[in-house]
Regions:
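N-terminal hydrophobic segments of proteins, predominantly signal-anchor/transmembrane helices
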Residues: 1-14, 32-102, 261
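Alpha-helical transmembrane segments of multi-pass inner-membrane proteins
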Residues: 4, 27-40, 69-80, 98-110, ...
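Alpha-helical transmembrane segments and their immediate interhelical/interface regions
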Residues: 13-26, 83-112, 266-287
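Membrane-interface catalytic loops of GT-C/OST-like multi-pass glycosylation enzymes that act
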Residues: 15-19, 89-93, 170-174, 216-224, ...
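Membrane-interface capping segments at transmembrane-helix boundaries
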Residues: 41-46, 418-427
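A conserved mid-to-late transmembrane alpha helix and its immediate loop/hinge
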Residues: 172, 210, 299, 305-307, ...
Length: 430
């Protein structure tokens, strides 16, 4: 998942990359889940230990693990009650049906129980992200080295000759920024927390990832990386007074930042202008590249099916929200339907219901609480928690996808694994 899957560009260019990446996700994640289950069964059959009963498994799980299992169960109920059971199970245009959610949760829980985070995994991720960023730089220079764009087109034809922006072997630029929001915190925290001089090699993928994010300037990604850094630095401090001072400093920075945006954001343009307008109580559906419009239309659907939603990946079946743009080259009006809330938490609420969202948030918050307690002493906890935080901040503006979401679920699994090992065995370096 950290190498072949991440670098696999598909066989048909960006036009079909989501479908092909999803099939690769099923192969790798499904293979991991199946292989782990078979190995555990073999161990039981060869006398290496009996298979535990479901009740015993449940008792052995931590709070975060139980909440993830609950999130899956509530998603399954949502699928059973869905407005379209087939779409809810297999997935719609986003390929995030119950099948995909099952693999997210199963892989996360298995990693949290059996995974052993090794340093070479971080190096492998660093190499993969470096190659991805180098490809992105070539594309940003106007080249099409792998032929991922349609013939004769490049990155700068986005939203003119074709819909959307695409980069690297990830595809959609917003989804690429979600991966960067997990990668950048992981790399800089590792460079700070890991022992040995070799850790400084991680500054290479860190610099490349940061440069790509800055060049593309996806607002959600920028907020995710900055927000993660602000909240992570105090957590890494060992001294209690220093940590308290760090959090106080972060609070001051946030207050001053909001005050600055309120007072001067209107003069700066871009998303800072939009944020300033919102702080002044002026709402426009076009803000956030139309996200406010999508959020408003999505929120209108929530009361209809508050408890279990419409079913995973069914928003596109329930909303009439759409964007229209006139293509001067073709001389036609192009209409693009909305099939995601462009806010992962709102997306869960409308698709899987309020209980599923609460279970998901509770799983993240309980894992975060343990991260805060252990990150200063445990490098694995620090790295994985920072990656989860970066992803979760950008998720307020992002789209969950089987291309980027595995970064969250793997990091969350390793975070729970590292915390559980610390609690049982004491602090140790991995």
């Amino acid at each position: 998942m950290l190498s072949v899957f991440l670098l696999f560009p598909g066989l048909g260019g960006y036009a079909g990359i989501t479908a092909e990446k999803w099939r690769a996700f099923l192969l790798f994640s499904g293979g991991y889940v199946a292989l782990t289950a078979l190995l555990r069964l073999e161990l039981a059959l060869t006398g290496g230990g009996r298979l535990p009963s479901p009740a015993a498994v449940w008792r052995s799980m931590g709070v975060s693990q139980k909440l993830i299992a609950g999130f899956w169960a509530l998603s399954a109920v949502s699928t059973a009650l869905s407005v379209d059971k087939s779409v809810s199970f297999w997935g719609g245009p986003r390929y995030e049906g119950l099948l995909t959610i099952t693999l997210y949760c199963a892989a996360c829980l298995l990693v949290s129980r059996y995974g052993r985070p090794k340093r070479w995994l971080l190096w492998l991720f660093g190499v993969s992200m470096s190659l991805n960023c180098l490809l992105a730089f070539l594309q940003l220079a106007g080249y099409n080295p792998l032929g991922l764009y349609p013939q004769g087109m490049n990155y700068y034809d986005a939203n003119v000759l074709y819909a959307g922006e695409f980069l690297g072997t990830v595809g959609n630029a917003d989804i690429f920024s979600a991966v960067l929001c997990a990668a950048i915190p992981a790399f800089w925290i590792a460079a700070v927390k890991l022992p040995g001089r070799n850790r400084f090699f991680l500054l290479i993928p860190l610099a490349l990832c940061t440069a790509v994010l800055w060049k593309t300037f996806v607002a959600g990604g920028i907020v995710g990386v900055i927000g993660s850094a602000l909240l992570t630095v105090p957590v890494l401090l060992k001294d209690r007074r220093a940590r308290a001072a760090g959090f106080a400093a972060v609070l001051c920075v946030c207050v001053l930042g909001v005050a600055g945006i309120y007072a001067f954001g209107g003069q700066l343009g871009g998303f800072l202008y939009e944020a300033s307008e919102l702080l002044h109580g002026r709402w426009d559906d076009s803000f956030g590249s139309g996200r406010l419009y999508i959020w408003r239309k999505t929120a209108e659907l929530i009361p209809e099916r508050l408890l279990f939603g419409g079913g995973p990946d069914t928003l596109g079946l329930r909303t009439d929200a759409a964007f229209e743009r006139y293509d001067e080259t073709l001389g036609i009006l192009i209409r693009s339907s909305v099939d995601a809330a462009h806010n992962e938490y709102l997306n869960i609420l409308v698709n899987q219901g309020l209980p599923a969202l609460l279970a998901y948030l509770a799983a993240l918050l309980t894992a975060a609480a343990k991260w805060v307690r252990t990150a200063a002493e445990n490098p694995v906890s620090a790295i994985c928690g920072g990656a989860v935080l970066g992803y979760c901040v950008q998720a307020f503006f992002g789209i969950s996808s089987p291309i980027s979401a595995p970064c969250l679920w793997l990091a969350l699994g390793f975070l729970m694994n590292s915390v559980s090992h610390v609690s049982k065995e004491g602090v140790h370096d991995k």
